[in-house]
Amino acid sequence: MCQNCGCSAVGTVAHSHHHHGDGNFAHSHDDHDQQEHHHHHGNYSKSPSQQTVTIEPDRQSIAIGQGILSKNDRLAERNRGYFQAKGLLVMNFLSSPGAGKTALIEKMVGDRQKDHPTAVIVGDLATDNDAQRLRSAGAIAIQVTTGNICHLEAEMVAKAAQKLDLDNIDQLIIENVGNLVCPTTYDLGEDLRVVLFSVTEGEDKPLKYPATFKSAQVILVTKQDIAAAVDFDAELAWQNLRQVAPQAQIFAVSARTGKGLQSWYEYLDQWQLQHYSPLVDPALA
């Protein structure tokens, strides 16, 4: 839970394209700032090489966390209703740092922007490097700088979305902060939660972060172009994925070579066709 990981800061939105207002908003967690972190540590009677330490939050921390999440869930449902009314397919991309979120989104925008106008909300602790990169690829990108907060929240997404002309896009991608723990807990109002892990992270990644992979509708196994170079065992990886996340659609992809992307795009097109009408120019209706 994020109230136990030291998250507390001011979040700001920096944006270009469709400028409305100053593009900054303050976001703080008073509960995060004011509560001490109490942990109950496990038994240390075993030898150092055998110790497993279990850390459990106290009741006060649990109550605070439940309150934070309850508020976030209400705001996420509000986001979801708003996005659905606009006919938007909204995706929340989660991964560890360096798994290739930005590269994949950049490739998607380059391939699909003409037929599927796309905006991106980018979450990072600092800098707007990824947002600038995506703008160069043709995306409308809004940067949310979270400071010490290691995830995006529904309120941040709502404020960032206010900077976008949602009537002229049909897909919204949320690139979450690179982290496979805290973002899992926070619903942002998305239609699809897309979890990425790269071949460089090891076949057991899903076993180490089961909650994240269990929460995904889609899993993208990225950087397939270097799978052989890192001796990636695809069969073992798929076995682990199916064990942890049998509900998810899985695609093996490479942003560099384009491997697997057509199947991923077809999945998105089919999903959007089933749930929303395609974006139609009113002049042609």
From Swiss-Prot:
Keyword Membrane in record: no
CDD domains registered for this protein in UniProt: HypB
InterPro entries linked: CobW/HypB/UreG_nucleotide-bd (IPR003495), Hyd_mat_HypB (IPR004392), P-loop_NTPase (IPR027417)
Stated role: Involved in the maturation of [NiFe] hydrogenases. Required for nickel insertion into the metal center of the hydrogenase. Exhibits a low intrinsic GTPase activity, which is essential for nickel insertion.
Protein name: Hydrogenase maturation factor HypB
Segments for region (G-domain): 90-251
Basic and acidic residues: compositionally biased ranges: 27-36
Biological process (GO), any one: protein maturation
Superkingdom classification of source: Bacteria
GO molecular function term, any single one: zinc ion binding
Bias (Polar residues): 44-54
Binding site for Ni(2+) 2: C150, H151, C182
Null allele phenotype: Disruption of the gene abolishes hydrogenase activity but does not affect urease activity. The hydrogenase activity of the mutant can be increased by the addition of nickel.
Region (Disordered): 16-54
Record family assignment: Belongs to the SIMIBI class G3E GTPase family. HypB/HupM subfamily.
Extent of the signal sequence: none
Keyword Hydrolase assigned: yes
Gene3D superfamilies named in the record: P-loop containing nucleotide triphosphate hydrolases
Binding sites annotated in the UniProt record for Ni(2+) 1: C2, C5, C7
Protein residues bound to Zn(2+): C150, H151, C182
One Pfam family named in its UniProt record: cobW
Keyword line: GTP-binding, Hydrolase, Metal-binding, Nickel, Nucleotide-binding, Zinc
PANTHER family assigned: HYDROGENASE MATURATION FACTOR HYPB, HYDROGENASE PROTEIN ASSEMBLY PROTEIN, NICKEL CHAPERONE
